[in-house]
Regions:
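Short, surface-exposed beta-strand/strand-loop-strand elements in extracellular ectodomains
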Residues: 68-79
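Short, surface-exposed coil-to-beta transition loops
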Residues: 55-60
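Negatively charged, low-complexity tracts enriched in Asp/Glu with abundant Ser/Thr
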Residues: 2-54
Length: 110
């Protein structure tokens, strides 16, 4: 049981990969513009909370898949209930900002 958990954690995203995802989104400017906080790197990729927006998305999960592209989930978490608002699969690194802006309504830079 513990061995299976360790293997699933190893399959997840590393801190370095998580930092690279944030850098591809815009780094410090992205964090300031979107109110991103509470970053967590786990077996399903990087998850972080974002500020208020018109599409009621308050969490974003980004995972690197086997084709070296990203799968992005936009979530609404309320009272311990997780609802996936939208999912974008196969996003290239240079398209992460556009996918984020389109699905949250938040700008990532000035």
């Amino acid at each position: 049981m513990i061995q299976e958990e360790l293997e699933s954690i190893k399959e997840g995203m590393s801190k370095r990969e998580g930092a690279e995802v944030i850098a591809q989104l815009g780094g410090g400017r992205f964090i300031a513009m979107t109110g991103a906080k509470d970053f967590f790197i786990g077996p399903k990729g990087i998850v972080f909370k974002i500020g208020r927006n018109s599409k009621t998305v308050n969490y974003v999960r980004i995972n690197l898949n086997s084709m070296d592209t990203y799968d992005v989930e936009f979530l609404s978490v309320r009272k311990f209930k997780e609802k996936v608002k939208s999912t974008v699969k196969g996003v290239y690194a240079d398209s992460l900002r556009g996918a984020f802006e389109q699905n949250t309504g938040l700008r990532t830079s000035l």
